[in-house]
Amino acid sequence: PRLYNAEKLEAVEPVIDTTSARGAVQYQDCYLVDNDSRFVFSFVRSAIEAGAAVANYVELVSARREGDRWVCQLRDTDSGEEFTTTARVVVNAAGPFVDELNTAWGVTTDHRIVYSKGIPLIVPRLTTTRHNRVLAFFDDTQRLFYVIPMGQRSVIGTTDTRVDDPHTHVTDEDRDFLLAQINARLDLPEPLT
């Protein structure tokens, strides 16, 4: 890690407003050269090479336990054709719908999902293109949020708002919160709006 005082921070990343900064820490982490979709595709390709059967545009209609196997009814979402397969293991990766599927499958757990909405904003690139630094700040609630370079854009975020329904949307409050946080921490020619 490298430690920077405010003066050095201003020199290495001039977009940061250093008027109230005491310093910064720079450390190396990983950088995903492609986007997350390419990363997932690479993961799926590795699974295929290891012998996995994979399918796209397939919906799980039902799953039930029979002995030491899962019997899964699937539907091709393009053709509507249904078919059955078996598996030793089923990974419930349904995100906010995990509890709903567990109930449908008769699976009980000690844990329940707590819904949280996280939104990012995508804006024109805010940092220099010379370095692909991810900037991390503490927001007014002391949560970390980031400015992540992505080509000619920057991704700012995310929020973390507790919600009761997984079907949610971005609100003006979400946008206003992130814009206020980033405008207070960067020295931009014009505030982001």
Language model features with spans:
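Conserved beta-strand-loop-beta-strand element in the redox core of flavoprotein oxidoreductases
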Residues: R64-V90
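Residues that act as N-cap/strand-start positions at coil-to-secondary-structure junctions
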Residues: I48, Y57, T77-S79, Y115, ...
